[in-house]
Amino acid sequence: MHDAVELLRAPLAVRRNVRLCAELGADIVKTNWPGDGDAFARLVEAAAGIPLVLAGGSRLGDRELLGRMEAATAAGGIGCSVGRNIFMHRSPEAITRALSRVIRERWSADKAFTELQEAAPEGAGEPPGGAPVGREGPA
């Protein structure tokens, strides 16, 4: 089954699915990260004018999340749907502000990450692992 999941996440398959959403009349499409900004730009093109938002997927480190969002926005994405990366964050307010800076104010991921480190310094940018920050045991 792992191979089937990987096949569905392949850039060509994701692009085809975005195009299908556009052809079926979607008002907006939430899509997975295809690997880099150029591939995301091809998704924007495939969407034929339908706005794209970046899905969060697995819990990411802060720097990686902000970097993906910077690349997606530069490629024509309009926002993100990254709930897990916000509500599991040690400072949901700070990561939301950092994402807003990148998306709405066109800050670089590095600049937003620096501000995030100042606002929520403990472990800023560390890769995910263990229990969600700020929780004791299972949620």
Where are these regions (language model features)?
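Alpha/beta enzyme core
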Residues: 1-53, 60-78, 101, 107-111, ...
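Short strand-loop junctions, especially beta-strand C-caps/beta-turns
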Residues: 55-58, 85
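Flexible loop/turn segments at secondary-structure boundaries
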Residues: 60-61, 87-89
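C-terminal helical cap(s) of enzyme catalytic domains, especially alpha/beta-barrels
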Residues: 73-76, 88-127, 133-137
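Short acidic/histidine-rich active-site segments
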Residues: 80-87
